[in-house]
Protein backbone atom coordinates (compact mmCIF):
# COMPACT_ATOMS: atom_id res chain seq x y z
CA UNK A 1 0.00 0.00 0.00
CA UNK A 2 1.30 3.47 -0.81
CA UNK A 3 1.67 5.46 2.38
CA UNK A 4 0.65 9.11 2.73
CA UNK A 5 2.31 11.70 4.97
CA UNK A 6 1.77 15.33 5.96
CA UNK A 7 4.67 17.71 5.30
CA UNK A 8 5.68 20.64 7.53
CA UNK A 9 3.22 22.92 5.70
CA UNK A 10 0.32 20.61 6.49
CA UNK A 11 0.13 19.42 2.88
CA UNK A 12 -0.57 15.75 2.27
CA UNK A 13 2.23 14.07 0.30
CA UNK A 14 3.02 10.51 -0.61
CA UNK A 15 6.04 8.75 0.74
CA UNK A 16 8.27 7.22 -1.94
CA UNK A 17 6.84 4.21 -3.73
CA UNK A 18 8.87 1.12 -2.87
CA UNK A 19 9.57 -1.33 -5.68
CA UNK A 20 10.84 -4.82 -4.79
CA UNK A 21 12.63 -6.85 -7.49
CA UNK A 22 13.29 -10.60 -7.30
CA UNK A 23 15.26 -12.82 -9.64
CA UNK A 24 14.49 -16.29 -10.97
CA UNK A 25 11.54 -18.06 -9.36
CA UNK A 26 11.06 -21.81 -9.80
CA UNK A 27 8.40 -23.47 -7.66
CA UNK A 28 8.14 -27.05 -8.89
CA UNK A 29 8.31 -28.56 -5.38
CA UNK A 30 5.23 -28.94 -3.19
CA UNK A 31 4.42 -26.44 -0.40
CA UNK A 32 5.35 -23.35 -2.40
CA UNK A 33 4.23 -21.10 0.47
CA UNK A 34 6.94 -22.55 2.68
CA UNK A 35 9.72 -21.91 0.18
CA UNK A 36 8.61 -18.30 -0.31
CA UNK A 37 7.95 -17.58 3.36
CA UNK A 38 11.55 -16.58 4.12
CA UNK A 39 11.40 -13.58 1.76
CA UNK A 40 7.65 -12.90 1.92
CA UNK A 41 7.92 -10.21 4.65
CA UNK A 42 10.01 -8.00 2.33
CA UNK A 43 7.77 -8.73 -0.64
CA UNK A 44 4.57 -7.96 1.26
CA UNK A 45 6.07 -4.74 2.64
CA UNK A 46 6.69 -3.33 -0.85
CA UNK A 47 4.22 -1.16 -2.72
CA UNK A 48 5.02 -3.09 -5.90
CA UNK A 49 6.80 -6.48 -6.06
CA UNK A 50 8.06 -8.01 -9.30
CA UNK A 51 9.79 -11.37 -9.86
CA UNK A 52 10.89 -13.47 -12.82
CA UNK A 53 8.90 -16.66 -13.41
CA UNK A 54 11.33 -19.13 -14.92
CA UNK A 55 9.27 -22.19 -15.91
CA UNK A 56 5.76 -22.83 -17.24
CA UNK A 57 3.09 -23.86 -14.77
CA UNK A 58 1.04 -26.48 -16.57
CA UNK A 59 -0.01 -30.12 -16.64
CA UNK A 60 -0.26 -30.06 -20.43
CA UNK A 61 2.00 -29.80 -23.44
CA UNK A 62 5.03 -31.64 -24.72
CA UNK A 63 8.72 -30.87 -24.44
CA UNK A 64 10.04 -28.21 -26.77
CA UNK A 65 13.42 -28.95 -28.34
CA UNK A 66 16.14 -26.31 -28.23
CA UNK A 67 17.40 -26.31 -24.64
CA UNK A 68 17.55 -28.72 -21.73
CA UNK A 69 13.82 -28.73 -20.89
CA UNK A 70 12.60 -27.80 -17.44
CA UNK A 71 9.57 -29.71 -16.17
CA UNK A 72 6.26 -27.94 -15.99
CA UNK A 73 5.38 -26.85 -12.46
CA UNK A 74 2.01 -27.28 -10.80
CA UNK A 75 -0.31 -24.37 -11.75
CA UNK A 76 -1.60 -24.12 -8.16
CA UNK A 77 1.91 -23.25 -6.97
CA UNK A 78 1.42 -19.82 -8.53
CA UNK A 79 -1.18 -19.09 -5.86
CA UNK A 80 1.67 -18.87 -3.36
CA UNK A 81 3.18 -16.02 -5.39
CA UNK A 82 0.02 -14.00 -4.88
CA UNK A 83 -0.15 -14.84 -1.17
CA UNK A 84 3.51 -13.83 -0.80
CA UNK A 85 2.82 -10.39 -2.23
CA UNK A 86 3.99 -10.50 -5.85
CA UNK A 87 2.13 -8.07 -8.10
CA UNK A 88 3.81 -8.86 -11.43
CA UNK A 89 6.22 -11.25 -13.10
CA UNK A 90 8.46 -11.14 -16.13
CA UNK A 91 8.17 -14.27 -18.28
CA UNK A 92 10.67 -13.98 -21.13
CA UNK A 93 13.37 -16.57 -20.59
CA UNK A 94 14.94 -19.73 -21.92
CA UNK A 95 12.49 -22.10 -20.20
CA UNK A 96 9.05 -20.48 -20.40
CA UNK A 97 8.25 -22.33 -23.67
CA UNK A 98 9.56 -25.71 -22.48
CA UNK A 99 6.03 -27.16 -22.52
CA UNK A 100 5.03 -25.54 -25.78
CA UNK A 101 2.10 -23.18 -26.35
CA UNK A 102 -0.07 -25.02 -23.84
CA UNK A 103 2.40 -24.28 -21.07
CA UNK A 104 2.41 -20.57 -21.86
CA UNK A 105 -1.38 -20.49 -22.15
CA UNK A 106 -1.92 -22.23 -18.80
CA UNK A 107 0.66 -20.09 -17.01
CA UNK A 108 -0.86 -16.85 -18.24
CA UNK A 109 -4.39 -18.02 -17.48
CA UNK A 110 -3.47 -18.79 -13.87
CA UNK A 111 -1.63 -15.49 -13.44
CA UNK A 112 -4.63 -13.63 -14.84
CA UNK A 113 -6.97 -15.44 -12.46
CA UNK A 114 -4.73 -14.46 -9.55
CA UNK A 115 -4.47 -10.83 -10.62
CA UNK A 116 -0.70 -11.06 -11.15
CA UNK A 117 0.38 -8.86 -14.06
CA UNK A 118 2.85 -10.32 -16.55
CA UNK A 119 5.02 -9.38 -19.51
CA UNK A 120 7.35 -11.21 -21.86
CA UNK A 121 5.37 -14.19 -23.17
CA UNK A 122 2.16 -14.73 -25.07
CA UNK A 123 0.30 -16.42 -27.89
CA UNK A 124 2.00 -14.09 -30.41
CA UNK A 125 5.07 -11.87 -30.52
CA UNK A 126 2.85 -8.79 -30.31
CA UNK A 127 1.36 -10.04 -27.04
CA UNK A 128 4.76 -11.10 -25.69
CA UNK A 129 6.17 -7.61 -26.28
CA UNK A 130 3.19 -5.88 -24.68
CA UNK A 131 4.09 -4.21 -21.36
CA UNK A 132 2.39 -4.97 -18.08
CA UNK A 133 1.15 -1.73 -16.52
CA UNK A 134 0.63 -1.42 -12.77
CA UNK A 135 -1.01 1.53 -11.05
CA UNK A 136 0.14 2.52 -7.58
CA UNK A 137 -0.49 5.76 -5.72
CA UNK A 138 -1.83 7.55 -8.78
CA UNK A 139 1.26 6.68 -10.80
CA UNK A 140 1.85 3.95 -13.36
CA UNK A 141 4.73 1.50 -13.79
CA UNK A 142 5.33 -0.39 -17.05
CA UNK A 143 7.21 -3.70 -17.13
CA UNK A 144 8.84 -5.04 -20.30
CA UNK A 145 10.53 -8.45 -20.41
CA UNK A 146 12.98 -9.93 -22.93
CA UNK A 147 14.95 -13.13 -23.36
CA UNK A 148 18.53 -12.47 -24.52
CA UNK A 149 19.89 -16.03 -24.42
CA UNK A 150 17.65 -18.16 -26.63
CA UNK A 151 16.85 -20.83 -27.61
CA UNK A 152 15.41 -19.41 -30.79
CA UNK A 153 12.77 -22.16 -30.72
CA UNK A 154 11.24 -20.38 -27.71
CA UNK A 155 10.92 -17.02 -29.47
CA UNK A 156 7.39 -15.90 -30.24
CA UNK A 157 6.41 -15.06 -33.82
CA UNK A 158 3.39 -13.45 -35.45
CA UNK A 159 1.53 -16.75 -35.21
CA UNK A 160 3.42 -18.82 -32.62
CA UNK A 161 3.38 -18.63 -28.85
CA UNK A 162 6.67 -17.92 -27.14
CA UNK A 163 8.65 -15.19 -25.45
CA UNK A 164 9.75 -11.68 -26.36
CA UNK A 165 13.44 -11.55 -27.23
CA UNK A 166 16.36 -9.31 -28.05
CA UNK A 167 18.52 -10.75 -30.79
CA UNK A 168 22.26 -10.94 -30.15
CA UNK A 169 25.19 -11.41 -32.48
CA UNK A 170 27.11 -14.65 -31.93
CA UNK A 171 30.85 -14.64 -32.49
CA UNK A 172 30.72 -17.71 -34.75
CA UNK A 173 27.44 -16.99 -36.52
CA UNK A 174 25.63 -19.82 -34.76
CA UNK A 175 21.96 -19.55 -33.72
CA UNK A 176 21.28 -17.83 -30.41
CA UNK A 177 21.16 -20.33 -27.56
CA UNK A 178 22.12 -20.42 -23.86
CA UNK A 179 25.45 -22.02 -24.80
CA UNK A 180 26.22 -19.92 -27.90
CA UNK A 181 29.13 -17.43 -27.83
CA UNK A 182 26.99 -14.30 -27.47
CA UNK A 183 28.89 -11.18 -28.46
CA UNK A 184 26.83 -7.99 -28.85
CA UNK A 185 23.31 -6.66 -29.33
CA UNK A 186 22.01 -6.98 -32.88
CA UNK A 187 20.75 -3.78 -34.53
CA UNK A 188 17.31 -5.36 -34.47
CA UNK A 189 17.47 -5.58 -30.66
CA UNK A 190 18.22 -1.87 -30.36
CA UNK A 191 15.26 -1.09 -32.61
CA UNK A 192 12.97 -3.28 -30.49
CA UNK A 193 14.08 -1.55 -27.30
CA UNK A 194 13.54 1.90 -28.76
CA UNK A 195 10.12 1.04 -30.15
CA UNK A 196 8.79 -0.81 -27.10
CA UNK A 197 10.15 1.56 -24.44
CA UNK A 198 8.90 4.60 -26.35
CA UNK A 199 5.43 3.03 -26.46
CA UNK A 200 5.58 2.08 -22.77
CA UNK A 201 6.51 5.62 -21.78
CA UNK A 202 3.20 6.81 -23.24
CA UNK A 203 1.38 4.44 -20.87
CA UNK A 204 3.37 4.86 -17.67
CA UNK A 205 5.44 7.21 -15.55
CA UNK A 206 8.25 4.71 -14.93
CA UNK A 207 9.54 1.88 -17.14
CA UNK A 208 11.28 -1.25 -15.88
CA UNK A 209 13.05 -3.52 -18.36
CA UNK A 210 13.78 -7.12 -17.36
CA UNK A 211 16.53 -8.90 -19.31
CA UNK A 212 17.11 -12.65 -19.13
CA UNK A 213 20.85 -12.53 -19.72
CA UNK A 214 24.29 -13.55 -18.58
CA UNK A 215 26.60 -16.52 -18.10
CA UNK A 216 25.13 -19.17 -15.83
CA UNK A 217 26.84 -20.56 -12.72
CA UNK A 218 29.76 -18.13 -12.99
CA UNK A 219 30.64 -15.61 -10.24
CA UNK A 220 31.00 -11.92 -11.09
CA UNK A 221 31.74 -12.10 -14.81
CA UNK A 222 29.62 -10.14 -17.27
CA UNK A 223 29.43 -11.31 -20.87
CA UNK A 224 30.52 -8.82 -23.52
CA UNK A 225 26.96 -7.92 -24.51
CA UNK A 226 25.50 -7.37 -21.03
CA UNK A 227 26.48 -3.78 -20.28
CA UNK A 228 25.80 -2.60 -23.85
CA UNK A 229 22.29 -4.05 -23.92
CA UNK A 230 21.43 -2.79 -20.42
CA UNK A 231 22.72 0.68 -21.27
CA UNK A 232 20.82 0.60 -24.57
CA UNK A 233 17.62 0.06 -22.60
CA UNK A 234 18.41 3.12 -20.47
CA UNK A 235 19.23 5.20 -23.53
CA UNK A 236 15.89 4.17 -25.03
CA UNK A 237 14.12 5.55 -21.96
CA UNK A 238 14.04 2.81 -19.33
CA UNK A 239 14.31 3.90 -15.69
CA UNK A 240 15.34 0.59 -14.09
CA UNK A 241 17.01 -2.44 -15.69
CA UNK A 242 17.06 -5.83 -14.00
CA UNK A 243 18.83 -9.00 -15.07
CA UNK A 244 18.35 -12.67 -14.23
CA UNK A 245 19.19 -16.12 -15.67
CA UNK A 246 22.68 -16.79 -14.25
CA UNK A 247 21.41 -18.35 -10.97
CA UNK A 248 24.02 -16.32 -9.13
CA UNK A 249 24.04 -12.58 -8.41
CA UNK A 250 25.92 -10.03 -10.50
CA UNK A 251 27.08 -6.50 -9.87
CA UNK A 252 25.07 -3.30 -9.62
CA UNK A 253 25.69 0.07 -11.25
CA UNK A 254 23.98 3.45 -11.31
CA UNK A 255 23.95 5.13 -14.72
CA UNK A 256 22.88 8.79 -14.70
CA UNK A 257 20.78 8.15 -11.62
CA UNK A 258 19.16 4.98 -12.98
CA UNK A 259 19.89 1.59 -11.39
CA UNK A 260 21.03 -1.49 -13.28
CA UNK A 261 20.89 -4.76 -11.37
CA UNK A 262 22.92 -6.92 -13.73
CA UNK A 263 21.87 -10.16 -12.08
CA UNK A 264 19.37 -10.62 -9.27
CA UNK A 265 20.28 -14.29 -8.98
CA UNK A 266 17.74 -16.71 -7.56
CA UNK A 267 14.66 -15.13 -6.06
CA UNK A 268 13.39 -18.53 -4.97
CA UNK A 269 14.43 -21.63 -6.89
CA UNK A 270 13.45 -25.04 -5.55
CA UNK A 271 13.48 -27.88 -8.04
CA UNK A 272 14.23 -31.57 -8.37
CA UNK A 273 15.08 -31.12 -12.06
CA UNK A 274 18.79 -30.74 -11.23
CA UNK A 275 18.98 -33.73 -8.91
CA UNK A 276 21.54 -36.35 -10.01
CA UNK A 277 18.99 -39.04 -9.23
CA UNK A 278 16.17 -37.79 -11.46
CA UNK A 279 15.24 -39.96 -14.43
CA UNK A 280 15.13 -37.47 -17.33
CA UNK A 281 18.16 -38.27 -19.57
CA UNK A 282 18.78 -34.73 -20.86
CA UNK A 283 18.47 -33.15 -17.42
CA UNK A 284 20.62 -35.84 -15.81
CA UNK A 285 23.33 -35.22 -18.42
CA UNK A 286 23.15 -31.44 -17.86
CA UNK A 287 23.60 -31.90 -14.11
CA UNK A 288 27.07 -33.31 -14.76
CA UNK A 289 27.95 -31.29 -17.86
CA UNK A 290 27.38 -27.91 -16.20
CA UNK A 291 29.84 -28.80 -13.43
CA UNK A 292 32.54 -29.44 -16.03
CA UNK A 293 31.65 -26.38 -18.13
CA UNK A 294 31.59 -23.92 -15.24
CA UNK A 295 33.99 -25.54 -12.80
CA UNK A 296 31.92 -25.91 -9.66
CA UNK A 297 30.60 -28.60 -7.36
CA UNK A 298 27.26 -27.94 -5.65
CA UNK A 299 27.05 -28.27 -1.88
CA UNK A 300 25.27 -31.63 -1.35
CA UNK A 301 23.14 -30.05 1.40
CA UNK A 302 21.34 -27.97 -1.26
CA UNK A 303 19.32 -30.79 -2.77
CA UNK A 304 16.62 -28.48 -4.16
CA UNK A 305 18.97 -25.66 -5.23
CA UNK A 306 22.19 -27.34 -6.41
CA UNK A 307 23.88 -24.25 -7.78
CA UNK A 308 27.32 -22.68 -7.47
CA UNK A 309 28.28 -22.53 -3.76
CA UNK A 310 28.51 -18.73 -3.95
CA UNK A 311 24.82 -18.57 -4.95
CA UNK A 312 23.90 -18.75 -1.25
CA UNK A 313 24.69 -15.00 -1.27
CA UNK A 314 21.47 -13.61 -2.70
CA UNK A 315 19.50 -10.38 -2.81
CA UNK A 316 16.26 -8.64 -3.59
CA UNK A 317 16.56 -5.35 -5.43
CA UNK A 318 14.75 -2.40 -3.84
CA UNK A 319 14.10 0.98 -5.43
CA UNK A 320 12.38 3.97 -3.82
CA UNK A 321 10.64 6.23 -6.33
CA UNK A 322 9.89 9.70 -4.99
CA UNK A 323 7.31 12.29 -6.05
CA UNK A 324 9.85 14.15 -8.18
CA UNK A 325 10.78 11.01 -10.10
CA UNK A 326 14.05 10.43 -8.26
CA UNK A 327 15.22 6.87 -7.66
CA UNK A 328 17.11 5.55 -4.66
CA UNK A 329 18.43 2.04 -5.21
CA UNK A 330 19.43 -0.60 -2.73
CA UNK A 331 19.26 -4.29 -1.95
CA UNK A 332 17.68 -6.47 0.70
CA UNK A 333 20.31 -9.10 1.55
CA UNK A 334 19.19 -12.72 1.36
CA UNK A 335 20.81 -15.99 2.40
CA UNK A 336 19.81 -19.34 0.91
CA UNK A 337 19.43 -22.08 3.52
CA UNK A 338 19.61 -25.81 2.78
CA UNK A 339 17.96 -27.44 0.95
CA UNK A 340 17.18 -24.22 -1.01
CA UNK A 341 14.96 -21.84 0.95
CA UNK A 342 15.86 -18.12 0.71
CA UNK A 343 15.56 -16.10 3.92
CA UNK A 344 16.11 -12.44 4.72
CA UNK A 345 19.67 -12.07 6.00
CA UNK A 346 20.50 -10.22 9.20
CA UNK A 347 23.57 -9.50 11.32
CA UNK A 348 26.85 -11.02 10.23
CA UNK A 349 25.18 -12.98 7.43
CA UNK A 350 23.85 -9.75 5.93
CA UNK A 351 27.34 -8.32 6.27
CA UNK A 352 28.78 -11.21 4.28
CA UNK A 353 26.23 -10.65 1.51
CA UNK A 354 27.09 -6.93 1.48
CA UNK A 355 30.81 -7.65 1.17
CA UNK A 356 30.16 -10.22 -1.54
CA UNK A 357 28.09 -7.82 -3.65
CA UNK A 358 30.71 -5.09 -3.39
CA UNK A 359 33.44 -7.56 -4.32
CA UNK A 360 31.73 -9.13 -7.33
CA UNK A 361 30.69 -5.73 -8.68
CA UNK A 362 34.36 -4.73 -8.87
CA UNK A 363 35.40 -8.15 -10.18
CA UNK A 364 32.85 -7.81 -12.98
CA UNK A 365 34.55 -4.64 -14.23
CA UNK A 366 31.84 -2.27 -13.01
CA UNK A 367 32.45 0.99 -11.13
CA UNK A 368 33.17 0.48 -7.41
CA UNK A 369 30.04 -0.20 -5.35
CA UNK A 370 29.51 0.93 -1.78
CA UNK A 371 26.49 -0.39 0.10
CA UNK A 372 25.50 1.52 3.23
CA UNK A 373 23.32 -0.32 5.77
CA UNK A 374 19.99 1.26 6.64
CA UNK A 375 17.01 -0.18 8.45
CA UNK A 376 15.11 -1.01 5.25
CA UNK A 377 17.95 -1.98 2.90
CA UNK A 378 21.59 -1.68 1.92
CA UNK A 379 21.65 1.61 0.02
CA UNK A 380 23.71 1.89 -3.18
CA UNK A 381 26.09 4.85 -2.87
Walk through the language-model features, giving the residues of each:
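Acidic, metal/ion-coordinating pockets
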Residues: 1-381
